[in-house]
Amino acid sequence: MGKSWKTAGKVEKAQQKGQIFTKLAREIAVAAKAGGPDPNANARLRMAIDAAKKVSCPNDTIERAIKKGAGLLDDGKVIEELTYEGYGPHGVGVIVECQTDNKHRTAPDMRHAFKSHDGNMGESGSVAWMFERVGLIEGTKEGSFDPDEEAIEAGANEVFADEGTYEFFTAADDLDAVREALTSRGWKVTKGELSYKAKNITELSDEQRKDVEEFLNYLDDMDDTHRVHATI
């Protein structure tokens, strides 16, 4: 990074924080547009605001994003939700969900990302068949409990533990009902969204996995990327 590595590191961290704020603001705007500007009546917006506050996103940034999504602030830019899919290195199926104010920028950027990592961006549906559309809920709960029993009682299909947080998978149509059931059972829900779950996992060697993870991290760091899904 050169002789100014300390300064450069600070600049890089600031840039990364700015990128995170931009992505969070887009999700807030999209959520407000889809379900209205009242977080008490819009669970997606409420969770997006909570996520933004968790990383100290400025309040004025949050308020502007809500107004923009609700149509109360016109800056001449419209945020669209777009999905790109294709094959990454070693034949791994990849779906990238984007939020962008310029699809003419995002599409070529995505195409370049796939190509530069020995992948190939395909047409709509080219790898979607490798995934199941599901509801994904993440949350935590105090005290002792049986995760499997919690999942059954709430109507979820599966539950997985991930460093103190639990992921519940549901049928896509059951997302809201399961989220409400978990909340009523004392869960603090930190994420509730439609997602993609790989039907089958692509077998990889350790070296191949490094290639794929490098590609997925690259995608995740792109300005317009919202979520990345892969068959690993």
UniProtKB/Swiss-Prot annotation:
The keyword rRNA-binding does not apply. One of its GO terms (cellular component) is cytoplasm. One of its GO terms (molecular function) is DNA binding. The keyword Transcription applies. Its main location: cytoplasm. Keywords: Cytoplasm, DNA-binding, Transcription, Transcription regulation. Pfam families: TACO1_YebC_N, Transcrip_reg. GO terms for biological process: regulation of DNA-templated transcription. It is found in: Cytoplasm. Belongs to the TACO1 family. This is Probable transcriptional regulatory protein Bd1964.
